[in-house]
C-alpha cells in the first residue's frame, strides 16, 4: 500500500511539496503534484512547454509544439547519456503521442506507456498547477516522484527568475528517501 506523503504547504498550507503516490481507478500507480504559483496560467504554460526551459529540468528532449494526435519522440538528454550511460534510439522511433493541448490550461501526452497530464487553472493569486503521471511500472513510483519534485523546483525557480544553482538529477537522488 502506498503512503500519502505531505509536508508544510507553500501558500497558506494548501500546497504540499511532496507528490502523492496513489492507485488509479483502473489499478495503475500514479503520482500527483499540486503547486500554487504567483504567476498567470500563460507564464506557467511557457515554463512547461518552452524547449529552452524544458532542457533545464525535463528528463527528455521533446518538441511539444505539435497538433493533438501527433506522434512524439522523447530523446535521451546528453546528461542522462553522460551520467547513466543511457543510449538514444538511433532510429528516433516515436515513443509517445500528444493527447491534449489546450493552451494555457491542459497539456497531456503519452510517453512510453505512461500518461502525463499538466492542468493549469487561474487563482486569485496566480495559478494552480496540477501534474499527474500515470506510470507504466509501479516500481518506478519512488524515483519518478523524486525526479518530478526536483523538476518542479526548477520550474518554480525559472518562474521566479532565480538562477538554478543545483543539479536537478542530484537533487532527485536526495529527494528519493522522502518517497520510501
Question: What function would you assign to each model-found segment?
Answer:
Residues 28-34, 71, 93, 106, ...:
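Intrinsic-disorder/low-complexity, polar/charged segments enriched in Ser/Thr/Lys/Arg/Asp/Glu/Gln
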Residues 21-22, 64, 98, 118-120:
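A structural signal for short hydrophobic beta-strand segments in well-ordered beta-sheet cores
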Residues 99-100, 105-157:
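Beta-strand/loop substructures that line and gate deep hydrophobic ligand-binding cavities in soluble
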Residues 32, 51-91, 167-174:
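Short beta-edge strand/loop motif at the mouth of beta-sheet-based domains
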Residues 2-64:
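Hydrophobic ligand-binding cavity/cleft-lining segments
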Residues 27, 88-92, 110-112, 123:
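A generic structural micro-feature
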Residues 2-16, 135-180:
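A conserved amphipathic terminal alpha-helix motif
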Amino acid at each position: 500500500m502506498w503512503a500519502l506523503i505531505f509536508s508544510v504547504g507553500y501558500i497558506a498550507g494548501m500546497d504540499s511539496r511532496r507528490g502523492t503516490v496513489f492507485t488509479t481507478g483502473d489499478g495503475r500507480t500514479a503520482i500527483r503534484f499540486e503547486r500554487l504559483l504567483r504567476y498567470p496560467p500563460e507564464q506557467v504554460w511557457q515554463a512547461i512547454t518552452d524547449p529552452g526551459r524544458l532542457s533545464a529540468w525535463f528528463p527528455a528532449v521533446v518538441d511539444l509544439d505539435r497538433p493533438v494526435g501527433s506522434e512524439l519522440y522523447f530523446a535521451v538528454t546528453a546528461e542522462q547519456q553522460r551520467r547513466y550511460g543511457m543510449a538514444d534510439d538511433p532510429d528516433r522511433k516515436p515513443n509517445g503521442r500528444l493527447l491534449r493541448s489546450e493552451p494555457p490550461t491542459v497539456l497531456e501526452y503519452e510517453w512510453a506507456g505512461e500518461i502525463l497530464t499538466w492542468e493549469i487553472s487561474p487563482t486569485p493569486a496566480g495559478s494552480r498547477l496540477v501534474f499527474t503521471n500515470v506510470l507504466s511500472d509501479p516500481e518506478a513510483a519512488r524515483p519518478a516522484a523524486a525526479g518530478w519534485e526536483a523538476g518542479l523546483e526548477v520550474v518554480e525557480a525559472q518562474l521566479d527568475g532565480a538562477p538554478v544553482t543545483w543539479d536537478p538529477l542530484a537533487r532527485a537522488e536526495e529527494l528519493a528517501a522522502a518517497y520510501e
